[in-house]
Swiss-Prot record:
HAMAP family registered for this protein in UniProt: Salvage_MtnC (MF_01681), Salvage_MtnC_euk (MF_03117)
Physiological role: Bifunctional enzyme that catalyzes the enolization of 2,3-diketo-5-methylthiopentyl-1-phosphate (DK-MTP-1-P) into the intermediate 2-hydroxy-3-keto-5-methylthiopentenyl-1-phosphate (HK-MTPenyl-1-P), which is then dephosphorylated to form the acireductone 1,2-dihydroxy-3-keto-5-methylthiopentene (DHK-MTPene).
Coiled-coil ranges per UniProt: none
Protein name: Enolase-phosphatase E1
Disordered: annotated span: 258-1107
First-level EC class: hydrolase
Length: 1107
């Protein structure tokens, strides 16, 4: 490769700005390693770090960028919805993938990439690629005094990670600052101008290294020197680009040595070096001045700082090229290597810029101002302290009038070597003067402090004699003036030597209170301090406090007589030194005699001080003992009272526990015992209260009284509980008796209910007339059925029996007067029915009486009337009501009564002569009898006793055959009826679940013709009309009354046979009904009328079918 010619400005550049991708690192590393890693782990990073502030910030920035792209109508932009939930993570990932596919360089994208890459760098999966020539170049540039900056599209964090975790090690120490796209885009001129301002350099002083021509042009426009890198894998450069810019393939192509020579030969550089040295010299002079002033002061911290600064300045004067004071400051910000190089080349004015260049935003001017302010503040503070310290030192020397300068030098050296010790002792001395520190603070000193104090004393003793001589030769007044001056200094916390001596002496004094040290004399401050500490430690009563105060006042008065030995510890030091000088030299006899007098006085004062202290301590101890004994006595009294109270309360509780368990006879005795215990407790507590009143306030007596009242309340509550329990027991006994009475009443009612049913059965049996053997068998079956139904009769209520009695009474009262036209045969039947009625009425009256005793007849009557009204309106519900309300026994009773009524009704209906009219009359009686049989059949079907019903029907048919045997005409009719009757009975068995039964004949309503044994008979009655009957005279009598009676009687049977059409003698008819629609009851009436035709000629009436 041909040699490259460089412009002098390029070689003279002091600030080098480098790109990363294609310049310091390969493009393939970014595209093949970093980008794929970011795409692969971005989602994982977002999920694991979603709650972190950095993640939230970068996501918000990505959202804003997407919104801007959408407004700019960027093709394919992927927006991110608002919100902080993790549901938007997939949208964020899509946005990142879209931007990376477009090779975008947005700040938000680069920031997120840097966060993702950080994980890879830290765990070692990623190592930053750097060309081999980069590390060498960075080292050489730093050694030559140049500063290196990085400007890349990647984030600052990513840049640092790459150089920190590079393949060639940690290179971050060679970089002075980092800039990313936050300062501006790399292809814009303004970005480079901003960087120049930040690093405080001109365009001619800066060099920009890049691989992108567009970036090079922008930097050139900003006035920077530019060199283009042609690395492997970079974009090819055109001939025009090569002509316009200097092109190199490695950093080693830059002539670093020539850069060094140009710097040394450049006059401008020399001027900057001289300026910097002059500044350093000025600063060093100021620091030496402050150091000397601080050395004379007694402030340990300032003296230490001054000494250190003096050493630093001395080293700076020896070697101007190295300035560690400022190098140290810059090193704290990570820019030490660059700063060192800059200082070696006289670059001190620009070095603070590195403090704020890492973020790419702050300016170097601000950094320099801050550094300058720091130095000014330090110098001002040291000078002020030095002035104050020098003023005090001069004041001290004037009062002491020491002719020697060695004393001050010795003191300064001692102060510098003991700065740490003085800080601790200063704080302790201040606390001692204020009277706040106590014994523990002084005792906790280390053995090292004691050794140092002894060394200080030796030094002070060596320096003290000449001053003492001068003082003793003059006058005692001078000594008093010196003491007063020292006291003032001590108040201002300037002189620390007396403080140290006093603290040491205080510690020794407190450790050995009994012994009397000779060498140390207690000053006035320390004696008052001891009194204060005694007050704080031992102050149990007011009397003790007063005594302690008086003791301190006495000691102060005694000390006021002689100020010389009691003012300061400095005087005590002089005393000890004076004793030594007496043994050494005879020339100081005068001073020795004076010092002996002073010592005698101090010893006397110490003895006088200790005597009142010991007396005070003894008095305090005695008082404390008295107070403690009094407290113990009071506590013992309290405990005795508490134990007595506890024992009494336990006794009361035991009594209360026994009271509920005792019987009624022992309640009175228990109450009296409780009262006695309470009275005894009161007496015991009264005895206990008497001594308590002597040592305790009235509040304790009130508490004992309250406890006694509580005990009384406990006994009262126990008594009330026993009374309440007794009342509860009596109430429970009364309830039990009431329940027993109710049970007996219920049992009596049940027996009463069972008795009438048995009596009814007994009375019903004789009413049935004796018949032939064929009739006895059905009766037996009926009796068996009745016995089975007795169990059901027992469960019936009193209301059903009352209903039965009323229904029995009604037919008796509803007799018509149409009995004038009767035949002798009908009269015979009438007599028999009357007998049956009388027996039935008798039974009814007896039942009525029994039911009145049960007080339920009225309620049953009311319920019956309501039911009858309902049945007239709704015929369809009649079968259901009859099923629920009627028991079998009562229904049998009603059937018997109805047969008797129907026979009576036939008296005014039957014809007295033979013929067709006679047949009609007989049919009427037959229909009544058939109706009775039908009602019994219907009731039996409801109770699911179909077998007895069929037998009753057969019984009726046999009776009809016997009655019709006398006439041949009726025999023919009966023979024709039997097959139809048997067919009807069979049909009724098959349709037992249904309430109504139908015969083989068809029933036609509204008077239409109907078939009876294949014969037609004309019918006239309409709904609501009365049946007309033809008498012997040919007149027509209306049977409206009788029909109505039949209707009412049928409804009183709980409508058991409502909507039923039964057959008798093979005929099926319709009868009038009181309801609006034709019912089965009217049909049954007409059938019974026709049945009387077949029975008219027979000698026996139809009463035989009552059963």
């Amino acid at each position: 490769m041909a040699a490259v010619s460089f412009d002098e400005k390029v070689l003279a550049a002091k600030k080098i700005i480098c790109d990363i991708e294609g310049t310091t690192s390969s493009i393939s590393f970014v595209k093949d390693v970093l980008f794929p890693y970011a795409l692969k782990h971005v989602e994982e990073y977002l999920k694991n770090h979603w709650s972190e502030d950095a993640t939230k910030t970068v996501v918000a920035a990505l959202r804003e960028q997407a919104d801007e792209d959408k407004k700019a109508e960027v093709e394919g932009v992927v927006t991110i919805p608002a919100g902080d939930s993790e549901d938007i993570i997939p949208d964020v990932v899509k946005n990142v993938e879209w931007q990376m596919s477009q090779d975008r360089k947005t700040g938000a994208l680069k920031t997120l990439q840097g966060l993702v890459w950080a994980k890879g760098y830290k765990d070692g999966t990623i190592k930053g690629h750097v060309y081999e020539d980069v590390k060498k170049a960075l080292e050489q540039w730093n050694e030559s005094g140049r500063k290196v900056y990085i400007y890349s599209s990647g984030s600052v964090d990513a840049q640092k990670l790459l150089f920190e975790h590079s393949e060639q090690g940690d290179l971050i120490k060679y970089v002075a600052g980092y800039y990313d796209t936050k300062i501006g885009a790399k292809q814009e001129k303004n970005s480079y101008e901003a960087i120049l301002k930040n690093i405080e350099a001109t365009g001619e002083e800066a060099l920009f290294l890049t691989d992108v021509v567009a970036e090079a042009k922008a930097a050139k426009d900003a006035g920077l020197n530019v060199v283009v890198l042609d690395r492997p894998g970079n974009a090819e450069l055109s001939e025009e680009d090569r002509k316009e810019f200097t092109v190199i393939s490695s950093f080693t192509d830059l002539p670093i040595e020539s850069v060094k020579s140009t710097e040394t030969e450049n006059g401008a550089e020399k001027e900057t070096v001289t300026e910097s040295t002059e500044k350093v010299a000025d600063e060093s002079e100021k620091e030496t001045e402050t150091e000397t002033a601080a050395a004379e002061t007694e402030n340990g911290a300032e003296a230490e700082n001054g000494a250190s600064k003096r050493k630093i300045d001395e080293t700076a004067q020896d070697d101007e090229a190295q300035r560690p004071s400022k190098v140290v400051k810059v090193d704290q910000n990570g820019d030490s290597p660059a700063v060192d190089g800059a200082k070696q080349n006289g670059d001190s004015a620009e070095e603070p810029a590195t403090l704020s260049e890492t973020n790419g935003k702050s300016t170097g001017e601000d950094a320099m101002d801050v550094d300058a302010e720091m130095t000014d503040v330090e110098s001002s503070s040291t000078t002020k302290a030095a002035e104050a310290g020098t003023g005090k030192v001069t004041e001290k020397t004037e009062t002491e009038e020491s002719p020697k300068e060695k004393e001050t030098e010795m003191e300064a050296e001692a102060e510098v070597s003991k700065t740490d010790e003085k800080e601790d002792t200063k704080q302790q001395g201040e606390s001692v003067t204020d009277g706040e520190d106590k014994k523990g603070d002084v005792i906790n000193k280390n053995a090292e402090d004691d050794i140092k104090v002894e060394e200080e004393k030796n030094k002070e003793e060596e320096s003290a004699p000449p001053t003492k001589k001068a003082k003793i030769e003059e006058d005692k007044m001078d000594v008093d003036e010196e003491d007063s001056a020292v006291i003032e200094k001590k108040a201002d916390n300037v002189d620390e030597k007396p403080v140290e001596s006093t603290t040491d002496e205080v510690a020794k004094k407190e450790e050995n209170l009994v012994e009397t040290p000779v060498d140390t004399a207690k000053p006035e401050v320390t004696t008052s301090e001891i009194a204060v500490t005694d007050e704080t430690k031992e102050a149990p009563s007011d009397a003790a406090k007063e005594e302690s105060v008086t003791s301190t006042s006495k000691t102060e008065e005694e000390k006021s007589d002689d100020l010389v030995p009691t003012t300061t510890s400095e005087q005590t030091v002089e005393k000890s030194s004076a004793e030594k000088t007496e043994s050494k030299s005879e020339e100081e006899t005068d001073s020795g005699t004076s010092e002996k007098k002073v010592e005698d006085k101090s010893a006397n004062n110490e003895e006088e001080q200790k005597e009142p202290k010991e007396s005070v301590v003894a008095e305090k101890k005695e008082e404390e003992i008295k107070v403690k004994t009094a407290d113990e006595e009071t506590k013992s009294m309290e405990t005795d009272e508490v134990t007595v109270e506890k024992s009494n309360t336990k006794e009361v509780k035991d009594d209360n526990e026994q009271i509920p368990d005792s019987k009624a006879d022992q309640d009175f005795n228990a109450k009296e015992a409780a009262k006695e215990t309470v009275s005894e407790e009161l007496e015991v507590k009264a005895d206990a209260i008497v001594p308590a009143d002597e040592s305790k306030p009235k509040a304790q007596n009130d508490e004992t009284k309250e406890k006694v009242t509580k005990a009384e309340e406990v006994t009262k509550t126990a008594e009330t509980k026993t009374e309440e329990e007794e009342a509860k027991k009596t109430e429970e006994d009364a309830k039990k008796t009431e329940e027993d009475a109710k049970k007996t009443e219920k049992e009596v009612k049940k027996t009463d209910e069972e008795m009438p049913t048995e009596e009814i059965k007994m009375k019903d049996e004789p009413t049935v007339p004796e018949k032939s053997k064929s009739v006895d068998e059905p009766m037996a079956t009926e009796e068996s059925v009745a016995t089975k139904e007795e169990t059901l009769a027992e469960e019936t209520s009193a209301t059903t029996e009352a209903q039965a009695t009323k229904e029995d009474e009604k037919p008796v009262d509803t007799k018509t007067n149409e009995n004038d036209k009767t035949t002798p045969e009908v009269k015979a039947t009438e007599e028999k029915t009357d007998d049956a009625k009388s027996t039935e009425v008798a039974t009814a009256t007896e039942e009525d009486k029994e039911m009145k005793e049960a007080n339920s007849a009225e309620e049953s009557v009311e319920t019956k009337e309501k039911k009858t009204e309902e049945t007239h309106t709704t015929d369809e519900d009649k079968p259901k009501e009859s099923d629920v309300a009627k028991p079998d026994v009562v229904e049998k009773q009603e059937e018997k009564m109805e047969t008797s009524e129907q026979v009576d009704e036939t008296k005014g209906v039957e014809a007295t002569t033979a013929g067709p009219v006679e047949e009609v009359a007989v049919e009427a009686t037959e229909e009544d009898v058939a109706m009775e049989a039908e009602s019994s059949d219907a009731v039996k079907e409801e109770t699911k006793t179909e077998e007895p019903k069929s037998k009753v029907d057969k019984l009726d048919s046999e009776a009809m055959e016997v009655d019709s045997a006398s006439t041949s005409q009726n025999e023919a009719k009966n023979e024709s009826v039997k097959p139809a009757e048997t067919a009807a009975v069979e049909e009724s068995k098959t349709e037992s679940d249904v309430v109504s039964t139908t015969s083989t004949d068809e029933v036609k309503e509204n008077g239409t013709s109907e078939k009876v044994n294949t014969k037609e008979e004309s019918r006239v009655p309409e709904n609501g009309e009365a049946d007309s009957k033809v008498t012997t005279n040919g007149n027509h009598d209306e049977k409206a009354d009788s029909d109505k009676e039949n209707d009412t009687s049928a409804s009183n049977i709980e409508e058991a046979s409502s909507a039923t059409t039964t057959t008798t003698n093979g005929t099926s008819t319709e009868s009038d009904s009181s309801s609006t629609t034709p019912s089965s009851e009217t049909v049954a009436e007409i059938k019974s009328k026709k049945a009387t035709d077949a029975v008219a000629d027979s000698a026996t009436p139809s009463v035989e079918t009552e059963s």
